[in-house]
């Protein structure tokens, strides 16, 4: 069964795309970030946007899929949780059809982004640095779910999607990561 879903953000969303520059620093190489000018806060944030070549913002489909999987922690099938720390039943019965989910401003228009600057803790060192990331205050998206109804009924998938928006969230500093950003509500639900 195909379900067309429309979501609207109830809190701003913060993006933090993993760039090639980040990969170099993680794998032990050197990068411009380590050895030279980092650029303006806006230039730093611009590199972290999920945006296509025309500059249109999007949410990666795998991010929405991971959000659904993590929402499974709040649901049980029989005596077992749908998602545990090591496994989940969600991938066997639900998929997000789009690889790239275009964002809107929640009203059908193009979303605008601002620079969100705040300190972050580097887990490996415990040190603090300033991080400049893109923040979209008004946002929404439309995507499709392919659901195996032998595994999951549409009303269960709706509860899962509602919990994903309230308790898990999307992108950086979301509720699942002890933050307030990336929360959403389902505003459209069409079963085909």
Over which residues does each language-model region extend?
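RNA-interacting cores
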Residues: 1-192
